[in-house]
From Swiss-Prot:
Cited Gene3D superfamilies: 3.40.50.450
Segment forming the signal sequence: none
Record's protein name: UPF0398 protein ABC2016
Domain of life: Bacteria
Alphabetical list of InterPro entries matching this protein: YspA
Species this chain originates from: Shouchella clausii (strain KSM-K16) (Alkalihalobacillus clausii)
Length: 188
């Protein structure tokens, strides 16, 4: 529910890019814990009526959130939908071949894909437009963010604040708790 008590039908999910977290391989153990934390936060939204999860498909939290949605769709919530709305054509052009292949697979599995700008990257304004566009068209923002470590999520947060949209934070402490719980479960 948002702060007015209305259901969140569409939720924008974002956070740090992989390199901002020091993650340069999909096999990094941190990815597992980040996905598990995202899943823990998405489940209550879905159970309360969220129908669409929206991302721009950037490397890092947004793509891991897409993976979580695919998994939840397969195992527990077949009705949940994922939209990937890249800021411009060819967002992945400068990514590694492996990252491009994973991105293409995620796009193929998404329920809706459309570039916000039908042109290739031309200027930084396209990224600001993406942030404002996605925040405007969703009911709330779920963001992995640490106020002590500013980075790319700050732009989404600023847009959400300016538009009066509810912001739901995933803190580093939540991720650490997921790690502890997972290790405890493995110990048992």
């Amino acid at each position: 529910m948002n702060k007015e008590g209305r259901a969140i039908h569409s939720l924008l999910v974002t956070g740090y890019k992989a390199h901002e977290l020091g993650i340069f391989q999909e096999s990094h153990q941190g990815v597992h814990y980040l996905k598990k934390t995202i899943e823990n936060r998405l489940r209550p939204f879905i159970e309360e009526g969220t129908e669409w999860i929206i991302t721009s498909g950037q490397l890092g939290v947004e793509q891991w959130a897409a993976d979580v949605v695919f998994s939840l769709k397969e195992t527990a919530y077949p009705h949940i939908k994922l939209a990937i709305l890249p800021p411009f054509e060819g967002q992945e052009a400068n990514w590694s071949q492996a990252a491009q292949e994973r991105y293409a697979a995620r796009l193929a599995m998404a329920d809706f894909v459309e570039c916000i700008s039908k042109r290739p990257y031309e200027h930084v304004g396209q990224l600001r437009q993406k942030n404002d566009f996605l925040v405007q068209r969703t009911d709330g923002l779920l963001v992995l963010y640490d106020e002590e470590k500013q980075g790319s999520p700050l732009y989404y947060i600023a847009s959400a604040k300016a538009q009066g949209k509810p912001i739901f934070y995933i803190s580093p402490e939540e991720v650490e708790e997921t790690v502890r719980q997972d290790q405890y479960d493995d110990f048992l």
